[in-house]
Amino acid sequence: MKSLNVILTLLSLIISVLSKKVYYEAEDGKLNGITVFKELSGFSGKGYVGRFENPGNSVTVTVDAPATGMYDLSIIYCANMGQKINSLTVNDQSVGDITFTENTKFETKDVGAVYLNKGKNTIGLVSSWGWMWVDAFVINDAPNAAKDVSSKLNPTLVNPKAIPAAKKLYDFLKTNYGKRILSGQVGAAGQAGDEGQEIQRIQKATGKLPAVWNMDFIFESNDCTWRPQNPDITEMAINWWKKYEGKGIMAAQWHWNIAGKTGDFAFYSKDTTFNLENAVTEGTWEYEKIIKDIDRVSGHIKKLQAVNMPLIWRPLHENNGDWFWWGNNPKACAKLWKILYERMVNYHGLNNLIWLWNGNNDANTPVDYIDIIGVDIYANDHGPQTTAYNTHFDFYGGKKMVVLSENGRIPDIQQCVDQDVWWGYFQTWNSEFILQDSYHTDAQLKEYFNHKTVMNMDELPSFNVDSYNGDSGSSHNGNSESNSNTGNSDECWSINLGYPCCIGDYVVTTDENGDWGVENNEWCGIVHKSCWSEPLGYPCCVGNTVISADESGDWGVENNEWCGIVHKSCWAEFLGYPCCVGNTVISTDEFGDWGVENDDWCGILN
């Protein structure tokens, strides 16, 4: 192990040497519709740029990266004309909107990590709100370590009385977070589990159904005078739940229609005179009105709880903007969230809810009443939205799962994986966002839904359980008869239960028999084998990518830890082909099953 320790020491020294800040002056970049100024004091270089008066105005600098990876980025700016939001691009792809707090002098805005290729890259700032000044872009001249997204997640739901089905769903999401990204789709307004044009497009293009389905209680308030004919939204959701035997995930938002003393009911601020501040003040008629509406929607959700159906619940969504009546006062909105929670959980006994906050991240955010964080992004491209993800992840210190609760374009899945942008799930809005080729072609949908990282409905367990012991993130559909083999021996114990052996060791669930995984859309038993590196204090590698070698053997890195590589022989090696790491069968002949890995045929060990 001496050589391995030397390598680790050298890596640490290299990173410490390279991890310095490199400044790229904005005035030296490519300017579109903006000019160089020198009036303000405190700038570096030959000046600064602004003012970003018109849409599309931009500054772009070219930066050098010594290696491919994630790099911390900051922007030196001045926003003396008020808080501004403008868009960041990397290599001509949108990575998210950046909020620049109002100030009176040049200050540094930490943007977070961005993904850079080895060599030349472009970083740009494009006018959205505009009207600000940029002095320089600053990156660390060494890539960051891989992000640990799951180890700090809150272990349980905020509601200690959550029903077993909700606990199981949360554990399932938690177990897969940082490993898989679930697919999702928003249905038509007022519908639940409908398999209309959105689902039909997905299924036709991909052969898959989304893991997460979304409904909207948009018509379920007392002021709303129009709602669909029977069956109502609750009946539709229950029918969907029964049809798929609990093997689906339902999410819901509430476009809360309400009327003030004058005017019609609405959820947009501009269309209702309803007052949020009064609504969270006990004794007002506005307070009494919201309580009656909460009671109404709780009656619907209570029916879902009666059939053991958990629900990812997203009320007061997009409260970081002022376009909805509940979003124009962060402090009052946070108070309304707590009123919702207390009324629904403690008064109505709704324990099937997983609470998703989709809005402000500030001192008012009701962190102790939140399970999951949602972000809504309607981007102009399929970028992974790295900056938006990192901003929300970092605000909660990695304790809350971050999901795309609404998206226009699905982010490129492979880019998400490469850049450690682990959205728990994506959830595409309905209508043209999923139906039109200008947003998604059939080829893109097929690529994204069939990506090995994406989990669709066919891989979900049933969440319809009356009890749950909390020791797994999923369940398998095999029988539960006892087996003396517990997965700790080299013999494949699952064959006796009618399931194949896993090639990898990705644990999806555990029961009295042993550990279970999913490969080729089928449950398989995981056999935990020992290897030469374990006596040295290091686990066995699942893959076989060699990073280093010493007198002990070959070493790889997995899960940010060194591991020992075990070189197995298989029948294919005698024919001049390597052994497969996975077990996806492409072809079969007289020798056995064949797969393709690293653009080469390989033999599958059965």
Curated annotation (Swiss-Prot):
Signal sequence, renumbered to the chain: 1-19
Principal EC category: hydrolase
Catalytic activity, EC: 3.2.1.78
Active site: 318 (proton donor), 406 (nucleophile)
Superkingdom as given in the UniProt entry: Eukaryota
Catalytic activity: Random hydrolysis of (1->4)-beta-D-mannosidic linkages in mannans, galactomannans and glucomannans
Domain CBM10: from-to ranges: 491-527, 530-566, 569-605
Domain CBM6, chain residue ranges per copy: 22-140
Recorded GO MF terms: carbohydrate binding; mannan endo-1,4-beta-mannosidase activity
Cross-referenced CDD domains: CBM35_mannanase-like
Span of domain GH26: 164-458
Record text about domains: Consists of a catalytic N-terminal domain linked to a reiterated non-catalytic C-terminal domain.
Family the entry assigns: Belongs to the glycosyl hydrolase 26 family.
PANTHER family: GH26 DOMAIN-CONTAINING PROTEIN-RELATED, MANNAN ENDO-1,4-BETA-MANNOSIDASE E-RELATED
Protein name in the entry: Mannan endo-1,4-beta-mannosidase A
